[in-house]
Protein backbone atom coordinates (compact mmCIF):
# COMPACT_ATOMS: atom_id res chain seq x y z
CA UNK A 1 0.00 0.00 0.00
CA UNK A 2 1.35 3.45 -0.90
CA UNK A 3 1.67 6.24 1.62
CA UNK A 4 -1.03 8.16 -0.25
CA UNK A 5 -3.47 5.27 0.19
CA UNK A 6 -3.18 5.35 3.97
CA UNK A 7 -5.97 6.72 6.15
CA UNK A 8 -4.18 10.05 6.62
CA UNK A 9 -4.66 9.96 10.38
CA UNK A 10 -4.68 13.65 11.39
CA UNK A 11 -2.11 12.98 14.11
CA UNK A 12 0.30 11.46 11.61
CA UNK A 13 -0.21 14.29 9.13
CA UNK A 14 0.34 16.92 11.84
CA UNK A 15 3.50 15.15 12.97
CA UNK A 16 4.79 15.04 9.40
CA UNK A 17 4.26 18.77 8.85
CA UNK A 18 5.64 19.65 12.28
CA UNK A 19 8.77 17.76 11.30
CA UNK A 20 9.33 19.64 8.01
CA UNK A 21 8.27 23.09 9.24
CA UNK A 22 11.75 24.56 9.69
CA UNK A 23 12.78 24.26 6.02
CA UNK A 24 9.32 23.97 4.49
CA UNK A 25 9.28 27.18 2.43
CA UNK A 26 12.81 26.69 1.09
CA UNK A 27 12.12 23.07 0.19
CA UNK A 28 8.92 23.98 -1.67
CA UNK A 29 10.66 26.67 -3.69
CA UNK A 30 13.50 24.32 -4.65
CA UNK A 31 11.25 21.37 -5.51
CA UNK A 32 8.82 23.51 -7.54
CA UNK A 33 11.72 25.18 -9.39
CA UNK A 34 10.46 28.53 -8.13
CA UNK A 35 6.93 28.06 -9.49
CA UNK A 36 5.43 28.27 -5.99
CA UNK A 37 5.66 32.07 -6.10
CA UNK A 38 3.75 32.18 -9.40
CA UNK A 39 1.07 29.84 -8.02
CA UNK A 40 0.57 32.06 -4.96
CA UNK A 41 0.19 35.18 -7.11
CA UNK A 42 -2.27 33.38 -9.36
CA UNK A 43 -4.33 32.34 -6.34
CA UNK A 44 -4.53 35.92 -5.13
CA UNK A 45 -5.54 37.11 -8.60
CA UNK A 46 -8.29 34.48 -8.77
CA UNK A 47 -9.95 35.88 -5.66
CA UNK A 48 -12.19 38.93 -6.06
CA UNK A 49 -11.11 40.48 -2.79
CA UNK A 50 -10.10 43.88 -1.52
CA UNK A 51 -10.05 46.16 1.52
CA UNK A 52 -12.80 45.52 4.04
CA UNK A 53 -13.22 41.86 3.16
CA UNK A 54 -12.39 38.85 5.31
CA UNK A 55 -10.50 35.87 3.89
CA UNK A 56 -9.73 32.51 5.47
CA UNK A 57 -6.53 30.91 4.18
CA UNK A 58 -6.86 27.29 5.21
CA UNK A 59 -3.94 24.86 5.51
CA UNK A 60 -1.82 28.00 5.42
CA UNK A 61 1.29 26.41 6.89
CA UNK A 62 3.88 29.11 7.53
CA UNK A 63 1.42 31.77 6.27
CA UNK A 64 3.47 32.55 3.17
CA UNK A 65 0.28 32.21 1.10
CA UNK A 66 -1.66 34.37 3.58
CA UNK A 67 0.92 37.13 3.31
CA UNK A 68 0.49 37.07 -0.47
CA UNK A 69 -3.30 37.26 -0.15
CA UNK A 70 -2.96 40.20 2.23
CA UNK A 71 -1.45 42.26 -0.58
CA UNK A 72 -5.04 42.65 -1.84
CA UNK A 73 -5.82 44.82 1.18
CA UNK A 74 -8.27 42.26 2.58
CA UNK A 75 -8.09 41.04 6.18
CA UNK A 76 -6.65 37.53 5.87
CA UNK A 77 -6.30 34.90 8.60
CA UNK A 78 -4.03 31.87 8.38
CA UNK A 79 -5.42 28.60 9.73
CA UNK A 80 -3.53 25.32 9.98
CA UNK A 81 -3.59 22.27 12.24
CA UNK A 82 0.21 22.25 12.58
CA UNK A 83 1.09 24.67 15.35
CA UNK A 84 4.77 24.36 14.52
CA UNK A 85 4.14 25.42 10.92
CA UNK A 86 2.25 28.51 12.11
CA UNK A 87 5.01 29.29 14.61
CA UNK A 88 7.66 29.00 11.90
CA UNK A 89 5.82 31.73 10.01
CA UNK A 90 5.64 33.93 13.08
CA UNK A 91 7.44 36.82 11.37
CA UNK A 92 4.58 37.16 8.88
CA UNK A 93 2.25 39.71 10.42
CA UNK A 94 -1.10 38.08 9.74
CA UNK A 95 -3.54 36.56 12.26
CA UNK A 96 -2.95 32.84 12.82
CA UNK A 97 -5.30 30.19 14.20
CA UNK A 98 -4.71 26.50 14.89
CA UNK A 99 -7.68 24.71 13.32
CA UNK A 100 -8.95 21.41 11.98
CA UNK A 101 -10.31 21.90 8.46
CA UNK A 102 -13.23 19.56 9.16
CA UNK A 103 -14.27 21.39 12.35
CA UNK A 104 -13.48 25.06 11.87
CA UNK A 105 -13.71 27.31 14.96
CA UNK A 106 -15.66 30.03 13.13
CA UNK A 107 -19.32 31.04 12.96
CA UNK A 108 -21.47 30.54 9.89
CA UNK A 109 -20.96 32.93 6.99
CA UNK A 110 -18.22 35.09 8.51
CA UNK A 111 -15.81 35.09 5.54
CA UNK A 112 -16.13 36.69 2.13
CA UNK A 113 -13.75 34.11 0.68
CA UNK A 114 -11.92 30.94 1.62
CA UNK A 115 -8.81 29.57 -0.03
CA UNK A 116 -6.75 26.44 0.45
CA UNK A 117 -3.45 25.88 -1.34
CA UNK A 118 -1.87 22.43 -1.57
CA UNK A 119 -3.70 21.32 1.56
CA UNK A 120 -6.97 19.74 0.47
CA UNK A 121 -5.12 16.64 -0.70
CA UNK A 122 -3.80 16.05 2.83
CA UNK A 123 -7.22 15.93 4.51
CA UNK A 124 -8.63 12.43 5.00
CA UNK A 125 -12.26 13.55 4.55
CA UNK A 126 -11.72 16.43 2.16
CA UNK A 127 -15.42 16.51 1.24
CA UNK A 128 -16.22 17.32 4.89
CA UNK A 129 -13.62 20.09 4.75
CA UNK A 130 -15.22 21.54 1.62
CA UNK A 131 -18.59 21.55 3.40
CA UNK A 132 -17.03 23.32 6.38
CA UNK A 133 -15.51 25.92 4.07
CA UNK A 134 -18.96 26.51 2.60
CA UNK A 135 -20.45 26.86 6.08
CA UNK A 136 -18.10 29.65 7.14
CA UNK A 137 -18.44 31.53 3.82
CA UNK A 138 -21.22 34.09 3.36
CA UNK A 139 -23.81 33.59 0.61
CA UNK A 140 -22.30 34.97 -2.58
CA UNK A 141 -18.80 34.45 -1.25
CA UNK A 142 -16.13 32.48 -3.04
CA UNK A 143 -13.74 29.57 -2.77
CA UNK A 144 -10.42 29.08 -4.53
CA UNK A 145 -8.56 25.78 -4.29
CA UNK A 146 -4.97 25.70 -5.54
CA UNK A 147 -3.84 22.10 -5.80
CA UNK A 148 -1.65 19.77 -7.80
CA UNK A 149 -3.61 18.24 -10.65
CA UNK A 150 -3.35 16.33 -13.92
CA UNK A 151 -1.15 17.73 -16.73
CA UNK A 152 -3.08 18.27 -19.94
CA UNK A 153 -0.21 17.47 -22.31
CA UNK A 154 1.00 13.87 -22.60
CA UNK A 155 4.66 14.86 -22.88
CA UNK A 156 4.42 17.16 -19.86
CA UNK A 157 2.61 14.41 -17.97
CA UNK A 158 5.37 11.89 -18.68
CA UNK A 159 8.18 14.25 -17.70
CA UNK A 160 6.28 15.33 -14.59
CA UNK A 161 5.64 11.75 -13.48
CA UNK A 162 9.32 10.94 -13.87
CA UNK A 163 10.22 14.02 -11.82
CA UNK A 164 7.72 13.17 -9.08
CA UNK A 165 8.72 9.57 -8.66
CA UNK A 166 12.46 9.76 -9.33
CA UNK A 167 14.01 13.22 -9.09
CA UNK A 168 11.84 14.79 -6.40
CA UNK A 169 12.69 12.26 -3.67
CA UNK A 170 16.40 12.64 -4.46
CA UNK A 171 16.26 16.44 -4.28
CA UNK A 172 14.20 16.25 -1.09
CA UNK A 173 16.98 14.27 0.57
CA UNK A 174 19.30 17.22 0.00
CA UNK A 175 17.07 20.05 1.20
CA UNK A 176 14.38 18.63 3.50
CA UNK A 177 14.60 17.58 7.13
CA UNK A 178 12.18 14.74 6.35
CA UNK A 179 12.61 13.32 2.82
CA UNK A 180 9.91 10.69 3.42
CA UNK A 181 7.36 13.50 3.63
CA UNK A 182 8.11 14.33 0.01
CA UNK A 183 7.78 10.72 -1.06
CA UNK A 184 4.29 10.97 0.43
CA UNK A 185 3.85 14.21 -1.53
CA UNK A 186 4.66 12.51 -4.82
CA UNK A 187 2.39 9.55 -4.15
CA UNK A 188 -0.50 11.68 -2.93
CA UNK A 189 -0.32 13.86 -6.05
CA UNK A 190 -0.57 10.81 -8.29
CA UNK A 191 -3.59 9.56 -6.30
CA UNK A 192 -5.42 12.91 -6.36
CA UNK A 193 -8.55 13.45 -8.54
CA UNK A 194 -8.23 15.23 -11.86
CA UNK A 195 -9.71 18.62 -12.67
CA UNK A 196 -13.17 17.39 -13.69
CA UNK A 197 -13.54 15.09 -10.70
CA UNK A 198 -12.61 17.79 -8.20
CA UNK A 199 -15.05 20.22 -9.83
CA UNK A 200 -17.80 17.62 -9.36
CA UNK A 201 -16.85 17.28 -5.69
CA UNK A 202 -17.23 21.04 -5.25
CA UNK A 203 -20.77 20.83 -6.63
CA UNK A 204 -21.61 18.06 -4.16
CA UNK A 205 -20.32 19.88 -1.08
CA UNK A 206 -22.26 23.15 -1.10
CA UNK A 207 -20.56 25.12 -3.85
CA UNK A 208 -21.99 26.45 -7.11
CA UNK A 209 -20.56 27.20 -10.55
CA UNK A 210 -17.29 25.27 -10.17
CA UNK A 211 -14.65 26.11 -12.78
CA UNK A 212 -10.91 25.78 -13.07
CA UNK A 213 -7.84 27.25 -14.68
CA UNK A 214 -4.74 25.19 -15.36
CA UNK A 215 -1.35 26.52 -14.30
CA UNK A 216 2.02 25.25 -15.52
CA UNK A 217 0.41 22.94 -18.05
CA UNK A 218 -2.06 21.46 -15.58
CA UNK A 219 0.57 20.47 -13.03
CA UNK A 220 -1.45 22.77 -10.79
CA UNK A 221 -5.09 23.76 -11.16
CA UNK A 222 -6.97 26.67 -9.62
CA UNK A 223 -10.55 25.62 -8.90
CA UNK A 224 -13.02 28.38 -8.06
CA UNK A 225 -16.63 28.18 -6.91
CA UNK A 226 -19.29 30.37 -5.29
CA UNK A 227 -21.42 30.00 -2.18
CA UNK A 228 -25.04 29.96 -3.43
CA UNK A 229 -27.22 32.94 -2.58
CA UNK A 230 -30.37 31.53 -1.05
Curated annotation (Swiss-Prot):
Alphabetized, the UniProt keywords read:
Menaquinone biosynthesis, Methyltransferase, S-adenosyl-L-methionine, Transferase
Entry's SUPFAM superfamilies? S-adenosyl-L-methionine-dependent methyltransferases
One GO BP on record is: menaquinone biosynthetic process
Catalytic reaction list:
a 2-demethylmenaquinol + S-adenosyl-L-methionine = a menaquinol + S-adenosyl-L-homocysteine + H(+)
Database matches in PROSITE patterns:
SAM_MT_UBIE, UBIE_1, UBIE_2
Provide the coiled-coil residue spans. Answer: none
Cite the binding residues for S-adenosyl-L-methionine: 62, 80, 100-101, 117
Q: Name one GO molecular function term.
A: demethylmenaquinone methyltransferase activity
Q: In which pathway does it act?
A: Quinol/quinone metabolism; menaquinone biosynthesis; menaquinol from 1,4-dihydroxy-2-naphthoate: step 2/2
* EC number(s) given by UniProt: 2.1.1.163
| InterPro entries hit by this protein | SAM-dependent_MTases_sf, UbiE/COQ5_MeTrFase, UbiE/COQ5_MeTrFase_CS
Into which family does the record put it?
Belongs to the class I-like SAM-binding methyltransferase superfamily. MenG/UbiE family.
The protein's job, in short, is:
Methyltransferase required for the conversion of demethylmenaquinol (DMKH2) to menaquinol (MKH2).
Which NCBIfam families does the entry mention? MenG_MenH_UbiE, PRK00216.1-2
Q: Which HAMAP family match?
A: MenG_UbiE_methyltr
PANTHER family assigned to the protein according to its UniProt record, in alphabetical order: 2-METHOXY-6-POLYPRENYL-1,4-BENZOQUINOL METHYLASE, MITOCHONDRIAL (PTHR43591:SF24), METHYLTRANSFERASE (PTHR43591)
Which protein is depicted? Demethylmenaquinone methyltransferase
Native source organism of the sequence: Mycobacterium leprae (strain TN)
Top-down, what is the taxonomic lineage of the species of origin? Bacteria, Bacillati, Actinomycetota, Actinomycetes, Mycobacteriales
Amino acid sequence: MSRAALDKDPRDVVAMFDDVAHRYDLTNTVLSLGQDRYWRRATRSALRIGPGQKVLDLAAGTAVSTAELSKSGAWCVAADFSVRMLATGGARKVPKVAADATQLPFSDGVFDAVTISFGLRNIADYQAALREMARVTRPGGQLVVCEFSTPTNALVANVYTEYLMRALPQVARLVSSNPDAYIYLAESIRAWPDQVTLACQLSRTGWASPRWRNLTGGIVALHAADKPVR
